[in-house]
Amino acid sequence: MSDVVQDELSKKQTTRLNKLQKRLRREVGSAIADYNMIEEGDRVMCCLSGGKDSYAMLDILINLQQRAPVSFEIVAVNLDQKQPGFPEHVLPAYLETLGVPFHILEKDTYSIVKDKIPEGKTTCSLCSRLRRGTLYGFAQRIGATKIALGHHRDDIIETLFLNMFYGGKMKAMPPKLLSDDGANVVIRPLAYCREKDIAEYAELKQFPIIPCNLCGSQENLKRAAVKDMLKQWDRQHPGRIETIFTAMQNTAPSQGVDREQFDFVSLKQDPNAEFRGDVAEADLPAFDFMDTANSGHINLDDASKRQGTRIDVVSTFTP
C-alpha cells in the first residue's frame, strides 16, 4: 500500500483494507494451490484491462510473489484497442509506481468490431475474442507460461447459469484452462473471490479505474439479468451462492443424465455381487407401520412407542 493511500484512509478503513487483503490473499493462494496454477519458474502474464478485477489480481499476485514457496515472474500486459476516449497514460503511470515489467499493446480492434456488429447490438463477445487472440499470440512471443485473467467467482457462476438458460450446457469458466491449440495455459487466480470483496478492495486501494463502456456498447442484457438474479438470491438466502460454487466443485457424473460424462449404456447388474453400501429400498421396512397420526414422519427405530397400525400382507398375486 502506498504512503499516499495510507495517509488518506481512516484507521477504520485501513483495518478493513488489511482484512480484505488478507482474505483475498488467502483465497487466491488456495485457488493457485488447488489447481496448480503457478509453478516454479513460471512467467505469468497478467492481463490488465484497467478494471477493478484485473487491478486486484495484479496487486494480490505481487503480494503473494514475495512469500510464495515457488519463484515466478510477473509481466503486466494491457491491450489498447483504440476505443475513443481511452486514457492511454493511466496504466503506464500506475505500473511504473509498482516497478513491475509491463507492455502496452496497441491494436485497433474497435474499428473491426464497429464494422462487423450492427448498430445497437452488444459488441462485447466479438471484442473479447479479438482481444483474446491478440493476447494469446503475445504471450507466446514473450515466453509467458501462464496467462492470468481477472475473472472472479461471481463471473464463473454467472457463466454457468447463462450457459444453462440460453445454451443448454452445464458449462462455466474453469479456474485453469488449456487453449484449444494447446499453446497457452489460462489461469483465473480470483476464482474463489467474491466480486463485492474485490470492489470494496479496489475502492479502498484507490486503483485508477478505467471504465469499460468507452466503446458505447451496453452490457449484455442476459448477463445483467443473471447477475441481478444472483444478487437477489444472495440478499434473500445468504450462503446460497457459496453452496452453488461448492456444488460446481462436487459433481457426480453417475448421478446425472449426460451420456458423454458417464457410460450409462454399459451398466449391467452383477449377478455375483454381494450386498454392500447403502441400504436398498427393498431392505427397509418402509411399510411396516402406518402413520395414523398423519404426522408425516415415522420413527422406525422407536415404532413400538408410537401409535401405529401394523400392515399385514393379506394376499399376493403371481401372473
Swiss-Prot record:
Positions with a binding annotation for [4Fe-4S] cluster: 124, 127, 215
Statement: the UniProt record of this protein carries the keyword Phosphoprotein: no
Reaction catalysed by this enzyme: cytidine(32) in tRNA + S-sulfanyl-L-cysteinyl-[cysteine desulfurase] + AH2 + ATP = 2-thiocytidine(32) in tRNA + L-cysteinyl-[cysteine desulfurase] + A + AMP + diphosphate + H(+)
Pathway the protein acts in: tRNA modification
Keyword line: 4Fe-4S, ATP-binding, Cytoplasm, Iron, Iron-sulfur, Magnesium, Metal-binding, Nucleotide-binding, RNA-binding, Transferase, tRNA processing, tRNA-binding
Sequence motif: PP-loop motif, positions: 49-54
Major location category of this protein: cytoplasm
Similarity remark: Belongs to the TtcA family.
Other known facts: The thiolation reaction likely consists of two steps: a first activation step by ATP to form an adenylated intermediate of the target base of tRNA, and a second nucleophilic substitution step of the sulfur (S) atom supplied by the hydrosulfide attached to the Fe-S cluster.
Name the UniProt record assigns to this protein: tRNA-cytidine(32) 2-sulfurtransferase
Organism encoding this protein: Shewanella amazonensis (strain ATCC BAA-1098 / SB2B)
